[in-house]
UniProtKB/Swiss-Prot annotation:
PROSITE patterns: DEAD_ATP_HELICASE, HELICASE_ATP_BIND_1, HELICASE_CTER, Q_MOTIF. Residues 203-224 have a biased composition (Low complexity). It comes from Phaeosphaeria nodorum (strain SN15 / ATCC MYA-4574 / FGSC 10173) (Glume blotch fungus). The gene is PRP5. Residues 148-178, 197-262, 356-377, 389-433, 973-1016 are annotated as: Disordered. This is Pre-mRNA-processing ATP-dependent RNA helicase PRP5. Keywords: ATP-binding, Helicase, Hydrolase, mRNA processing, mRNA splicing, Nucleotide-binding, Nucleus. It catalyses: ATP + H2O = ADP + phosphate + H(+). The Q motif is unique to and characteristic of the DEAD box family of RNA helicases and controls ATP binding and hydrolysis. Its main location: nucleus. Residues 575-754 form the Helicase ATP-binding domain.
Amino acid sequence: MHGHRASASAIHPDYPVTHRESTWRRATLIVQGSTATVDDTLRPAVPARGLQAAEIAREIATEIATAVAEVVTTVTVLEIDVTTAETTAAMTVETTAETAAAHVHHPVARGHRTAEMIVTAETTAGTTAGTTVAMIGTGVEVPRHVGQARDVLQPHRPRTSAATREERVNPEKQKEDKLAERAAKLLEWKKRKEAERLAQEKAGTPGSGASPAGSVPSTPAVAATPPPREAKPTVAKSKVPKPATEKVKQKQPEKSSFKLDESAAARPLIAKPAGKPVAIAAASKYHHIDYKCSNQLTQTDGAAAAATTKANGNIGSFGLKTKSTAEEDISSKALLDDEIDTGKRKLQALPVFATHDEPETTAGVEDDAAMSDIGTDDDETNAQLQAKLQSRRAELSHDQAADKDTNMEEVPTADNTGDQMDVDDNAGAEEDDVDPLDAFMADLSVPQQPSRAAPQGETMFNDDLEPEQTAVEGEDLLALRAAKKKKKEVPTINHEKVEYEPFRKDFYTEPAEITQMSAEDVADLRHELDGIKVKPDDVPRPVTKWAQMGLLQQTMDVFTRVGYARPTAIQAQAIPIAESGRDLIGVAKTGSGKTLAFGIPMIRHVLDQRPLKPADGPIGLILAPTRELSLQIVNELKPFLNASGITIKCAYGGQPISDQIAMIKRGGIHILCATAGRLIDLLQSNSGRVLSFRRITYVVLDEADRMFDMGFEPQVMKILASIRPDRQTILFSATFPKTMAALARKALDKPAEVIIGGRSKVAPEITQHITIVPPSYEKKIAKLLHHLGQTFSDDENAQVLIFTERQETAEDLLSKLFKAKYFAVNTIHGAKDQTDRNEAINEFKQGLLNILIATSVAARGLDVPGLALVYNFDCPTHLEDYVHRCGRTGRAGNKGLAVTLIENPGQERFAVHIVKALKESGAEVPDDLQAMANAFHEKVKSGTEKYYNVGFKGKGLDELDASRALDKKREKRALKLGDDDASDDEPDLPKLKKPEASGPGVAKSTNGDAAAEPVQDEPAWKKLLLGKIVVNKTERAETGKPTTAKERAMAAARKIDGNLSRKGTVHAGQPIDNKGPDAGLYHSTLEINDFPQKARWAVTNRTNVAKILDATGVSITTKGNFYGPGKEPGETDLPKLYILVEGDTEGVVTQAMLELTRLLTDATVAAEEAASTRGPTGRYSVMS
């Protein structure tokens, strides 16, 4: 049957191999009396070209070769014509018992695809006689030669057979009966086999005890010829049918003796000889067989499976190899373990689709499974199976008792190999229902391991991939963050070991007309230029024209283009000093042109040095206190620097540091303008390999007093210490207190001081109005609205800058102005993102905004030429702050107005600074303001008050670090964390006094010292994080009204409890508003009202909530109202903001609560760290 596989070219010579259509064939064998009809249909069919339809039908009938010997003797093939769709009886083929087969598997290739044939045989009584499914994998290009088609076809996944009539009626019942019957027969058969083996052992049979290892040849490729059987010679069989009783006797030894003889055990396993392909091996290689069939079909199974073809046999007209009568008889009567044709036979594991209730495979199945693969075409597989079988035999020879689970036995040694196996007729009648192949297949309930040594996968469950839902202790969480957080330090450089390039500082040559001036003329000139004061006296003289400074022509052209006709006072004196190479301290009023005073000399300084290499750092460095000021410096200097081919870049916080690192690595930056904090970050990036200070020779500190006041003095000093000592350093500011001057001189080398118009002075172009108001927030807002109305009535396009002391006040004023119909309003303060701040400033400069509300962060560097009004809603706390605020208006010679509100009583101390500023600027002092200042002086004389004239004092970071360390220890105490990792330099907190017991019978201490410090209360949000998660079962609403007195009392109590809970906070697990029909079985609550805003956002934003919902399947609802600090809900108000988590099980609710708690903890700690690292924003601390 399997000796030939017809190729597409052999059947259809004109059919192209590249055809991609599917040509599946379904052939149905229908039994009617003694005739079987095969209905062969092609879909889509391929017409026969060059061949007759009768020849195709004969080939199909011959290859299918299906018939049950007892019923079917003739097969009729119906051919469907492709073009006319007519059915004709193409061929009738007779069959006999020897050629009939219950299970037929033969692939027929059709074009580029392969064929599928389903053959069904039915008896005259309507019962199922057998079902055969033949499937071949698709997608194989079939060669044009018949001999090559045999080795090209690929295996396909097995397909179950067609259902029989009874199975279609009740398939489940039929399967259960078959499984039960097979299991019972299998158990009985195993018992008999075990009894036989024990009987042989007792009789002293050496078959199982002898070790065959020594007789196994080393080369398994050479097959040993099995000796012929003496008692059973090969006899040619005729085609005459035999009685049923004779056939039964011939088949009993096949089913009952499933053994290996001694010669098979002693010789190596061999592969299939090349000359004779085996039918059952071919079928096993390409597809699996469904063995769920009736007993009548099973009896013919052994004969059909043993049928073989000869390689040297006759060739039919269609290339099919015919058999001789003798070979058919021999192959049909051979046993599975018989010596005849043992080398040609293939055994392979054939899985059965068993149910889960079948018994587990015993240890002996491992050997059976190994034996089932003997003789396959894969040499590597055969070698592995042979080694496995030999190892098993060696174990049997050493330990016979350990082989009780093996179901296969070895036959006696060579003395009995030639004897014919006896047939027990009585036993045959008893074992008629048990087939060894069926029993073997039933044992294969567990899939066997693959024969190849391939990498094995590992079973992974979804639960193994999930992180452990273990609550993280607060100590571990804070310890982890403390370990990650390191104090920013700039590495110290030993300049004595570094060899720096020499550079030139002095580029200034005094013009002849300036040299010829007398000392009196120079003094008069400095007096005309806003009273310039210089120290020492030997500094270069001031100039009056740009041409007298020795500038480049490109720079002169830019001055002409931007319209700067002559230098300002600070520029006239500072530029000659800077070009001469001396360090400089410049103090001038705001808007006087300090930026160009240090920027113009930088051009000559940079161009005089050699060009930059890719790895070189900048030559000039400008430090600014705020981001806005750094951007303004870059924008103002860029036209002049670009004209000379000099590149300037800006680096400040609020932007991704990765972008700025990439900018620096690209190189080519001559001047870098940066804030102190971001410059520290750049110095520490990649262990200091990002930014190099070797080429820096020109350093500028703009608004130096403000920079030191913000706590950057240690960082600034370390930055300056990392730069070569012979650098040129220039400091500029609008104010310069004496304490600040002492700190600045540490970083400068014999600096020259230039002071324009006094140390802290408001420009005379600015009109100052002081308004005294009572200490009422509403009255101050009324005054503000009154002044705004007057300003916009005079000029509707006017712009107003309002200063506040706190960020909260700025945001509140924004909402008040919105209500007053002022819509072109925005705010800037330290809590806003840098992008929002830049956008607001740009819109204000472009005139899109009429009102800008700001804290002191915008007082430095904000330059709006057309600003008409500066409004100090909160009074400045010291003189320097007042000067800087007022300096935002009246810039570049324009007129301006500054209005200041001061509260009386309450702000008498600030009146002293304002009176001093008015007197120094030559403005008139109001009488009521002078009275407030005099009253404060009287209080100072009486000792009830003292002066506070701190200005912008440099507090540094020592005090700030100490304050942060104190806050950290206080937080640890609140969280009840240990102090194991506490360092020695951390400040100690006063110990908390344990609360004393009180009540009847408890004596209270009368010692006055005992009433020491009060106990510090923990914040509410910390108590929530430390508390345990409580999950309650949801209370369902009652179906009816309470009838008994007890039920009415319980309902009233629950109502009262609900009302009380609405007044206060929501405790963890408190059941609130979750008694509806859609409420979960379990619920828990988490109050988030008192957490920081970032923490509340972390547990309420859609992204985080969606992740928790997907992971747990719970329902998360945000309920209640938000109440600010110090506010509590009333009796009829909703409770504080909280989260309600509902779920079907307690576990999922707990898991969701753990994740929410984690998000709250992370966001809260991040908010605390951000607040501590940012430091004070918009407020000034008064130091005594």
